[in-house]
Amino acid sequence: MGMAGYSFVHFDLETTLKTLKTLDMHYLCIKDFHLPLDSNEEQIAAFHQKLADYGVKGYAVGPIYMKSKAEVDRAFAYARRVGVSLLVGVPNYELLDYVEEAVKQYDIRLAIHLHGPDMPLYPDATDIWNHVKDRDERMGMCLDIGHNLRYGSDSLADYIRYHKRVFDMHLKDVTAPTKAGQRAEVGRGIIDFPRFIKLLRKYHYTGAVSLEHEKDMKNPFMGIAESIGFFRGVCQATR
């Protein structure tokens, strides 16, 4: 399991890392409010040392939005400086040819993040698949199972269909398969987590499943702990 840095958008890095240590979590998807895109080598080294002090590794960066070629260049250069091999990103559709060249140049995998009904860009897994299926195999998706479901798409069925291009996952639960569905602590919504975990094992998923907690974001700690505990419990119970 990992943690999506966005879960701590209202908190500094120290608070984030203390929380991860308390939860015995060791993998973080790095957001740029914790490590700015213009960070230099010295700042990045200090950042990694701070993570190491808490037993945490930054396994990816993002999500990073890319609305121009310059922003594509900046995102991939940042990922290389940070030293990760996975960039969670949201490039505009018209930039995908340019993004593909960057993927080849940097040899960094791109996991396009979907946002369900909340924005028109990459609303679900099928949309991402249709845009990457004929491109470099290092272009795939960050499957956000909650956002995907709120768009009306079956996240578990989509994982089965597209698992070869699922490089990262954002874990959350929701209360309904519509835009009106609310974010919920994992286990309190409608997602079938025992089946989800069994599918991850069946298809030999090797990426991170990172909690992106988007409920009570100014006081998320109890919800984060509940979600992590539930998910771990289901993992144990389904072995």
Please provide the spans of the model-predicted regions:
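Flexible, glycine- and charge-enriched loops at secondary-structure boundaries
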Residues: 37, 44, 72, 89, ...
